[in-house]
């Protein structure tokens, strides 16, 4: 398996910095692991019609890491770190506005 480049968008970095210490460490380790395996067993695909990258989420306790995988470029973009509940992926369209359509 090839190694993926992991990019965390600036807004997601800000969210990571605001997390409680224990959660922040778990989130950072999970993000680093995306370089070797961007589709860990506990991650789930998020259905987004007409979008080129595959959008997934990884659950860590009550937190979600929302990210996009572009296999052609071996790239993982971390888009958001959100607490659930109340997060319901309502801003997913805004997070993905810069990605090309199929």
Positions of PLM-derived features:
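A short, surface-exposed loop/turn module that caps and links secondary-structure elements
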Residues: 32-58
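Short histidine-centered beta-strand/loop micro-motifs
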Residues: 16-18, 56-59, 68-70
